[in-house]
A protein has these predicted regions:
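N-terminal auxiliary segments of SAM/dcSAM-dependent transferases
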Residues: 1-36
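Conserved alpha-helix/loop element of class I SAM-dependent methyltransferases that forms part
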Residues: 33-61, 68-74, 78
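Class I SAM-dependent methyltransferase SAM/SAH-binding core
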Residues: 58-109
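Conserved class I S-adenosyl-L-methionine
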Residues: 98-99, 148-174
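Short conserved loop adjoining the S-adenosyl-L-methionine
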Residues: 107-113, 129
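A short SAM/SAH-binding and catalytic strip from SAM-dependent methyltransferases
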Residues: 116-133
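A short glycine-rich, Lys/Arg-flanked "PGG" loop and its adjoining helix->strand segment in the class I
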Residues: 129-148
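Core SAM-dependent methyltransferase catalytic element
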Residues: 168-192
Length: 192
């Protein structure tokens, strides 16, 4: 859908779609401020994102939250059959592209339980805050059995500690750690 709205059968609300970009935040929705377009990160690269999420082919859906969403178009070209769902307000100005969906969301992700093959994001702070702790639970909820969550540390001296705290929060949700480095952690959903 390029223009219009999506209706929710549960809450009966309507969510606007303009230029192919969905605003799936719960009401009351503030106006989306003008934000710069999300650009692909230098690190991690699109290839690293695909590798750490274990993506070689489709089908499936993968959420890319925040700055990692800048790789959505490149990843859609690298891994056919996967729909990459970029979740960031800075995607509003992007052109439509095959294999890429663009939206913004609130604290609850607009996906069914266990519906995603993977989720990638850059740690914006530590999960010890109430918001990020509930985000770890929300990521766990939406990832399918054997699906992966990859968290990269934001550039700078706080990258390592933030990644370690995210690792602890995701482990507390019952996820298995597949890889743990100073700048990234990858976990796998084993329950469902």
């Amino acid at each position: 859908m390029i223009e219009g709205s999506l209706g929710c059968p549960n809450c009966r609300d309507r969510f606007p779609v303009a230029g192919g970009f969905g605003d799936l935040r719960p009401p009351p929705r503030s106006t989306l401020d003008e934000v710069a377009d999300v650009e692909p990160l230098v690190s991690p690269s699109a290839m690293e994102v695909a590798a750490l999420l274990g993506l070689t082919d489709g089908p499936g859906n993968v959420a890319l939250i925040g700055d990692v969403a800048g790789h959505a178009t490149a990843l859609a070209g690298l891994v056919p059959g996967i729909e990459f769902i970029g979740i960031a307000p800075g995607l509003r100005g992007w052109e439509e592209g095959e294999g890429v969906s663009r939206l913004t969301a609130g604290a609850s992700l607009p996906f069914s339980n266990g519906s995603l093959r993977g989720v990638g994001l850059v740690a914006e702070g530590s999960p010890s805050s109430a918001a990020n702790s509930s985000m770890a639970a929300e990521l766990t909820r939406v990832v399918a059995r054997d699906g992966r969550i990859a968290v990269w540390g934001a550039a700078g001296p706080t990258a390592g500690p933030a990644v370690r705290e995210w690792e602890g929060a995701l482990k507390a949700e019952g996820l298995d750690v597949l890889a743990s480095e100073e700048t990234a952690v990858v976990v796998r959903q084993v329950a469902r």
